Structure formats: C-alpha cells, structure tokens
Amino acid sequence: MTRKRTSPIRAVLRFAASVMMVSGVLLIADAALTLAWQEPISAYLAAQDQTALKHQFLKLPASKVRKHRAQLKGDAIAKIELPAIHQTSYVVEGTDTGDLRKGPGHYPDTPLPGEHGTVAIAGHRTTYGAPFRHIDSLSNGDRITIAMPDGTFVYRVYKTKIVDDSALWVKKKLSFDQLILSACHPLHSAA
C-alpha cells in the first residue's frame, strides 16, 4: 500500500484550521466559565464585602465622614437605596478597582450628599454583586435615598442619559444639587 504525500501548502492549511478550531473552542469555554464561575464567585465575594461594609457603616461616627473623608478610602460612607430596581448597597469612598469590588463608590472629587454640588457615585453592572445592573431601568420620578451617618438625603431621577466613558463633564458642579450615578454600558462591558 502506498501513501500519498500531502503538499506543504495543504499541511499548513490543515494546521491553521486546527489552530482556529481550538481557539474557537477556548473562546467559547472562556465565555461559559465567566458566566458560570466568575459572576457567581464575584457576587458571593461582593455580598461578603457588603456585610462587612454594613457593620462598618453602622459604627461610623457622624462627624468622621465629612471631616476625615480622605482617610476613609475604601471604607463605607453611605447606604444607597434604589427601590425602583430593588437595590440597596453600602457605598465606599473611592472609585478604584478595589473600591468598586466592594460596592458602589463615591467619586472623591465630588461633594458628599448634603453638600452643595454634584454628588457622583459609580457602580458595576456585571460582576462584584452588580449593584447598578438595572440602572438603565430607572425612570423619571424614581426615588434614590442615600443615608449618611449624619442624615438621609432623597433624590429623584429627572433624566437618564448614556454618555461616553470619557464624559467627565457629568461630574461638573452646577448651580443646583444633583446626584449622578454611573455604570458601564452596554451590559457586560467595562470601561
């Protein structure tokens, strides 16, 4: 029995096809693992962080947040309630990756609730408990309550807008008090 010899071009094409098939399988496996493993695990870890933040928030002296805010980076400073989307979370000071893994984060360069200007808070829509997963479902008139150690502040949604991730103007101080909530869009994207 004689065996036909394959041409070098055919061998290269066969190898390339094999590499592409294996790559495709790996990409699908990565997506499946992300949904089946990473999201539930990160949600579990975020729930543990939120429990710790709750205890931290309940012990926080009323004067500490406003006077020593810089020292509270990564610590609980507030509780945010968004009844329209059935979400309650503890807010940390800061918006770095580590801060946002714990829960929504207050932009340090913006005022705190109760201070004049634009209060800005960021949160994840996917992973780490996804506190702002349904932020796109908020409608005009929906209530947002932020409890601080020294008082409770109620805001109403008056506008929703999708902006580019470089739109830092949304945090600009205006002549009136407002709250800006920010999260990545579309769902499952990250800026």
Where does each model-flagged region fall?
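Solvent-exposed, non-transmembrane regions of membrane-associated and secreted proteins
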Residues: R3, P8-A191
